[in-house]
């Protein structure tokens, strides 16, 4: 697995983590390992900090990592490490901000369990804190299996400090006794020279029901693949469109040339009317529709998930009328199916809804 591609690069990522995350919880309490005093010390370490932009055993437990769709451009090898750019010195790491469930979340405790683990793995404040051993210790302190850290390597690193925040968390599937939580993450890392690198990834976290809380069984980081040198016009247009807000893995999916033009053109059409917050495109999604043996459209580059439009979260019941209208608009841009919080045609073939799709819109395409 290509580590560089797992930690997808976004040169245009905002300087402040969470700037495009209106649903991420407000900071409630700083972990003792990274309090405000520690952050101030990190800001002046090495002179001052700078800000860098870099951007179960069954088939159903696997996460999308597939080849390009038929007819897609060929790809070039990935660079050995993420590219970076350095801003002026003097900016500290953003403060940790634990995920807090908003209105309308289905079984928020399930998401919270998955996200606590990822935040713990990807946040540290001292030299060696990004090592496998140190991250495993943080999971152990939470009462979780420390071996899970071995599956979350994109969040580890040699830097002396890092902060990981949740941009969005949606279900890849939620059943009575099992679940898939798709966590879209931003991560800042403070390097030894006092510079901050901004990057991120998406992780598919698998859980099973247990007492007193759900238990994590696996973590599957996104693996978008290398960027192509022959990206089509629709892909270039999506990447350049300021009204399409892409997380790191989704941006890398598009840059790889592994997303069908029908999906990209639909996103552009939606962006004429809304500011579109994308959560998932291809990588980081279960290969099979959760709980079934049916291949998902996502790993084939034939689907896109959206968690907010014009800053309005799909999951929030207060936005229901707006979301229903948006689902109808989405159906007009070419998908064969639109999933969301409401089944607008009562069992017809265009719309569908279930517990999994209360927190995002899903647009699936035949080609």
Predicted regions and their residues:
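N-terminal secretory signal peptides
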Residues: 1-38, 43-52
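N-terminal low-complexity, Pro/Thr-rich disordered segments
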Residues: 54-108, 233-234
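Core segments of small alpha/beta cavity-forming domains
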Residues: 93-157, 254-258
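Second-shell loop/turn segments in exported
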Residues: 100-105, 248-258, 290-293, 310-318
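A short, amphipathic edge element
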Residues: 154-171
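Exposed beta-sheet edge and beta->alpha loop/turn motif
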Residues: 176-221, 226
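Catalytic cores and adjacent binding grooves of peptidoglycan-active enzymes
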Residues: 206-237, 253, 265, 277, ...
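Extended, low-complexity, intrinsically disordered C-terminal regulatory tails
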Residues: 259-292
